[in-house]
Structures are given as C-alpha cells and as structure tokens.
Amino acid sequence: MVGKAHHELLKEQHDIEIYDPALGYKHLKTPDAVIVCVSTPPRKDGACEMKNVFDVIETTPDVPILIKSTISVEGWDMLVDAFPNRMLNFSPEFLRAASAVEDLQNTDSILVGGSDPSFWGKVFNLPVEIAEVHELILAKYARNSFLALKVAFFNQMYDLCDALDVEYSAVAHYTTMDERIGDSHSFITEERGFGGHCFPKDINALVKTAQRNNVELSILKETVEYNRRIRKS
C-alpha cells in the first residue's frame, strides 16, 4: 500500500526502481536515493519486527534513505547504532488503506527527521517540516492507537445500548455531532472491534515500547484485551 502510493506519486518526477525480492525484483542498480516501505510485522511479544528494514538497508548503496515503514523508537535506535555512517531519515505515513494513493497525492507537506530532511523535500517537491525522529515515531503510533481506542469505546457503548434496549445509531449520531469527536471509527460492524493490518500491530508495539521504559499504558492495554475478547466472541 505505502510503496504503491509513493510509486504513483513520484513516477512522473523520477525514474523509479522497485526492489522487492518477494515479487521478483531482486536487484538495485545505482539509485540516487531509496525509500523503504517494507512491512514491520509484530513479533510474538508484540514488539515491532525490524528484520525487513535491516535487510533492505544492508543491501542498499550508500545513498540517502527514507524509512516510510512504521518502526518503533527502539527500532530506530537499533538502526542508528547498526549503520552510524548511513544517511538515514524517517517520515511517518498517515495514509488510509482504502485511499492511500489519493491521500498521498493530496499531501501538501511532509514530516521528516534524520540526517538530511531537506533533501527529501526536493525529492517530493513539497515543503518539509523537520522534526526529531522519536517524536515522529510516537506520533504515528499515537494516532493509530487513539483511533483503535475510539473503536473500542464505541463498541462498548454499543454493548451498553444493547443491554438497555436503546438505539445505538441514535446515540452515536448525537455523540458524534460534536466536531471534537466526529463520526469516524464509530460504526459497528459484524466483526466487532478493530482488525486489519495497522491498528492491532501499532497499539501493541506502543504498549511494548512503554513497558520497556517502565511506563504502564493501562488504557491501551485494556483496549487490546477488550478487543481480543470481542473479536473471539
């Protein structure tokens, strides 16, 4: 999704070379820069698996690298330690799965942190807001975790409405009339809770990062457990 969206955005401005061994694209020729959009699946303990990102960087020439994959704070620190002389940058993506290409094409600026953010403004031909990488990583996780929390909250409101024989759709409508809340992620589906690729992975990775730093994200932990229960039922 992320790789395809960036390909569509940049193909008119640059010669794009795809590197994806799983799809048969096994060799990089002489790129001027590399954008990393590989998956970072959860490990068994919920932490972010960095192997795919490491594999790409290890096979990439010494050129500027922009990581668009979702990575953890500790994952970034591992990369910096492993590749101290490489031109590493990170830029979070906030694309929706159903409209990733359109979302990226409508972007009017990019957030970048790392060794040379201004370079990537020239690549994308967009203004760059420069930030510290850890801030960007946590912001990415915070957005998805908050939306997962919102899904769980409205699912619990649905349960309460059901128990009281109250029409949930009316309650949700009157609640989300408040512009501060909005109606996104308030619709209840037959599957219940949140699934997909990003929300479960990212909320668990954020909880794991917090645990490693002796911080208890109790609200998010309960969200994960509640979601697990209703997804099984």
Regions found by a protein language model. Name each.
Residues 40-99:
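Rossmann-like NAD(P)(H) cofactor-binding subdomain of soluble oxidoreductases
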Residues 34-35:
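N-terminal Rossmann-like NAD(P) cofactor-binding module of classical short-chain dehydrogenase/reductase
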Residues 29-31, 62, 106-107:
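Alpha-helix C-terminal capping/helix-to-coil transition sites in glycosyltransferase folds
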Residues 27-28, 102-105, 186-191:
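Solvent-exposed alpha-helices and their adjacent loops that cap or buttress functional pockets
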Residues 1-10, 198, 225-233:
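Glycine-rich adenosine-cofactor-binding loop
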Residues 12-13, 77-91, 95-183, 209-216, ...:
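Internal alpha-helical scaffold of NAD(P)-dependent oxidoreductase catalytic cores
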